[in-house]
């Protein structure tokens, strides 16, 4: 049977099969690094180091001793894994002091990697397979290496062409060879998104982020770092005149510019996902209940129209 319970003006469906109740997954804690610009203030840190910092910051904020064994597992999204070493999520988990017995999994679903990590963690909680999990993502686009692909075929390294892992594995469609910027242009044409629409949206985003930092709203989630105290890519003084004066990057007369596109960033974030029962027992806040989620796929060249993840 399905029992409907009204909590915080939401309806949570709790399925009961042969007397077994599905747990309700909740977000009980969060922490992240400030996000750095490409080759910016966080360039000295690898993705694993950033992930370690986010996990450590989360545990500290929750007053959970890393060695306590409270955390049943870790899921971390990471797209640019080239050169990061085996099992980046496990590296970050152990780097944060979690016990050796703690399993960790690295996920690559491109833009949706860390959201997929949260979905999997929530599913484990609902199924009763885990009680407390950490889910998040980590990336250092700055430190994505160059690779000599031809060298593996016997070509001398000095004669091999170098390929950017950031571009090849992260910013280029594997099927059409188009850059993500072009796929954005395709959807802008298809959906009738104008240059002024994109610039206006970008200005609103920067303005809101700037206001949030100025009012101290972001300080509770961003951990303290020695060389970066806030997100580095926010343009506090941006105006519509500045944005509209930038040249399109990918198509003449196109929509996507350096001012209205997503930033190439370095950073990491982590959430504590647990059952509602556990949160209440431990006295942890119930920040959000994970009610449901879905995923789907579209034609690769139309990736910017896809839901994330």
Stretches found by the model and what they are:
Residues 68-77, 103-108, 133-137, 197-204, ...:
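Beta-strand segments within the central parallel beta-sheet cores of soluble alpha/beta enzyme folds
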